[in-house]
């Protein structure tokens, strides 16, 4: 039997598994079955806590989408990861350093119950996102057989494309998201953000996630939207991001500087399941 915990960050929900005290392995087929909301546990992503690969770090953090594919990063998941390892007694630290397949992150548990995550320095170089473009631009033209889109692009350890919309509530997230998430100019696929700028310190956002479709919240998507909005001269250093599942606070001092994200992490229940 595998012990697990169900958690969520603003409705972006996770099955979190301790791979430190349990010997676990998940095949893509098993993950897809577990992710099924009718016949399994049901989640957007599976988060796996592993021992550190580096003695200077506390844990290794792995993320699997509902389709079974492993991805580089998940900001909402990182907050839940921090709360999980502390709640389960895997650490007594309030400041936790972890590695992911994309790099290293620092997670800080706050007194009010929220978690602040150092998401690292945003990547704007197209070759590193990866995104097929000759050079970095504030805005790119993205063509499909149906229409042309204006977008910004950035990586927070995973690739993001951000579109400006006038009214995010009425944005065609499902159709446009499905169209762009596998666009040929993003060799590894892309998460697609739909951003409505309310004012320079406040945006509304919906995100179509690569491998998971639209979710109630996407932490890296919120970060990428603020990065793109700042680069385009629309947003301040600190921005409130309203997602369907709730609110995040993003703070970024500009190019070359790390980005900080603060938000909640909620425990739902503990369970066990036979694979």
Swiss-Prot record:
| Amino-acid positions noted as binding substrate in the UniProt annotation, renumbered to this chain | 12, 45, 65, 75-76, 158, 191, 209-210, 219-220
Q: Where is this site: Important for dimerization?
A: 269
| UniProt key word Amino-acid biosynthesis | yes
What does the UniProt entry say about where the protein is found? Cytoplasm
Q: Where is this site: Could be important to modulate the pK values of the two catalytic cysteine residues?
A: 160, 209
Highest taxon, organism lineage: Bacteria
InterPro entries cross-referenced by the UniProt entry: DAP_epimerase_AS (IPR018510), DAP_epimerase_DapF (IPR001653)
Q: Name one GO molecular function term.
A: diaminopimelate epimerase activity
Annotated keywords: Amino-acid biosynthesis, Cytoplasm, Isomerase, Lysine biosynthesis
User: What does the record give as the active site?
Assistant: 74, 218
Q: What does this protein do?
A: Catalyzes the stereoinversion of LL-2,6-diaminopimelate (L,L-DAP) to meso-diaminopimelate (meso-DAP), a precursor of L-lysine and an essential component of the bacterial peptidoglycan.
Subunit structure and binding partners: Homodimer.
Q: What is this protein called?
A: Diaminopimelate epimerase
Organism of origin is: Shewanella sp. (strain MR-4)
